[in-house]
Amino acid sequence: YTVDRTVSATAVSASPGALNASTALFRALMSNLDAWVKGTATPLASNWPKVADGTMSVPTTDPKSLSAIDLPTLGLAYSGVYNTLTVNDESVIPSIPSNKMYVVHQPTQDAQGNSKSGVKMPDSAVPLASFMSYSIRKSGFVAGDQNGLSSSQLGFALNTSAKNKADTRKSVQELYGTKAGYLSAWNASVDKLVADKLMLADDAIDYKNRGLMQSAQPNFSTLGQ
C-alpha cells in the first residue's frame, strides 16, 4: 500500500513524494504530435482547468482557497506560496520588469484532495492518496519553505474503521470496496486513456501491472476488513 510511507530522518521534505506515474502520457502525446506533423492524425482534444467552471482559482495563504479539505490538519503542510510573474517590457534587451503582476491561478481540488480537471493518469483517476504539486521543507531544512519542484502526498485511510475523524476524504474501502473493485476501476481508467489516445497500447500492459503491484502490497490484503 504505497501511500502509507514514512519520511526518512535525512529527507528534506516533511511529506513523502507523490507516487503518480505519468510518463506514458508524454509518449502518447509525442506519438500524436509526430502523426499530426505527418498529416496522419488530428490533435487530441484539449483538457485543462478553467476559471469559468471553478476548476482553477487564485490561491491564498488559506489552504481552503483551493480545497474544501483542511489538509494541514491531517498532516500535509501548506504555505500558500507559488511562482509569480511580472509584466515585462520585452521591447528592449535585457527586458525590464514592472511592478505589475499577472494573476496566477492554481487548480482547485475535489473532495478527495486532488485536482478536479486535467488529464488524469490511473494514479489520479483511481487514487489512493491526495497528490500535491508542492512539497514543504521540514525542521532543519529551512522549515516551511518550498522544496524546489518536489511533490507530496497524503494517503487515504485504507479501511473506514481506521479513518481519522477529522478526515473528510473517503477511505479506500469507501471508494472501491474490495481489492477486485480497485483493480476493476484501475483497469477501466487505463482502457479509457488508450481509447482517448492518451496512452499507447504497449504502455497499457505496464500500467495494468502497476495496478496489480499496488494491490499486492501487504496492507492491501486487509482492505474491506
Model-inferred region functions:
Residues 1-225:
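C-terminal His-loop and adjacent cap/lid subdomain of alpha/beta-hydrolase
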